[in-house]
Amino acid sequence: EESATILKANRATIIRRVTIPIVMPAILSTFLLIFSSGFSSYTVPVFLGSAVKCYTLSTKMRALIQAGYQGQGYIIAFVSILLGCLILGVNQHFTGKRKSFTTVTGKSGQVSLVKLHKANWPISILLIVFTAFFAIMPLISFALESVIRQPGNYSPSNMTLHFWIGTEDSAYETGMIAGILLNTTMWSALLRQVLLALVVSAIVGTCGMLIGYACVRRRGSRLSRMVESLAFFPYLMPAMAFATIYLAVATSANFKFLYGTFGVLVLVASIKFLPFASRSGVNSMMQIAPEIEEAAVIFGVPWRTRMTRILFPIQKSSIISGYLLPVISVMREVALFTLLVPYARYLLTTMLFSFNETGYAQYGSAVTLLIILIIILINFVTNKLTGASFDKGIGG
């Protein structure tokens, strides 16, 4: 773009002839990935669509399996997997045709600012309102919904803290003996969820870093492309279809020891969230020139020492971010675990789903707000201790 600017090309020509051809594969890839994410979504359709009888493949799949029609549910899962393969193929087709006009290496120090003039304040206000509506208002809504006895009535006389700190003596007939902060079932589910997140993070983060290292060091080879595609493929599979596969495996004669165990949750979550860590590993390793490691190889430095004393310190924030993302993903995941948990209140997220299914909206709102606060706390503590943060990007 700067070369075109020096040659007096106007902004419209630069965008049409330079910028768009370069970023078009990325735009198409983003569209395909967002389409895949929306297509495989389960939580949003089941919460918002059930009331108006709007069903998707994911919600239909779970309903069929729970009703005893496993065969039909597995067929829907198979169709979802085929669509995921198709999306992956189209994505690889477009991203494999990247164009590049790079003539020299290095980064420019030129900064181009756009003067908004009178539009400065309107645009700023619009962005503030937009951010507040989608980021702050939901938190306020969950907080209010968790302290009212009758939904929709926000008068002070209708508010209570029972759903948070209510004791057994003051409990309503709601299926719980106390508020969520004083209930042992909730704390057990929270501890399992945190333990699951930490175990999955350790497995996925380490595997993602190693996959990124191997793919970057063998960049361009057929094996590298194959490994990178296979590591990314679970992202394109609907979480409900993914859980259905492992449900079928765990209920088979040879693998019944997995059914309803903590181990099967670790296994399915590790594979499902591997794409995020592998992508983070690839991005972080691509930013390190191979000459740095080659210098250590010449001096006979072992591979383990090169990883721990050279590569990891250079990309510490990016690598730790690769460990952080699986933690956050596990802490908010519902669809992946709803078919595999031994009972509805085994994990905090499945407990939330159980509350909403049985009509206990206040408990559901309280648990949702608690999950959000825990995720924010994890991100804040990680940022303070290591400098890595989810809001600063993954693998950047």
Briefly describe each language-model feature range.
Residues 76, 80-192, 258-262, 379, ...:
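N-terminal, non-cleaved signal-anchor transmembrane helix
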Residues 1, 15, 25, 109-113, ...:
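Cytoplasmic-entry segments and transmembrane alpha-helices of multi-pass inner-membrane transporters
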Residues 11-40, 125-139, 233, 271, ...:
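Transmembrane alpha-helices
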Residues 12-13, 45-53, 108-113, 148, ...:
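Membrane-interfacial helix termini and adjacent extracytoplasmic/periplasmic loops
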Residues 38-42, 46-85, 116-120, 149-175, ...:
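Interhelical loop and adjacent transmembrane-helix boundary motif
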Residues 1, 5, 9-14, 44, ...:
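C-terminal transmembrane helix and the adjacent membrane-cytosol boundary/short C-terminal tail
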Residues 14-19, 92-96, 141, 197-231, ...:
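Transmembrane-helix boundary motif in ABC transporter permease subunits
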Residues 25-26, 35, 184-197, 236-238, ...:
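Loop-to-helix entry region at the N-terminal start of transmembrane alpha-helices
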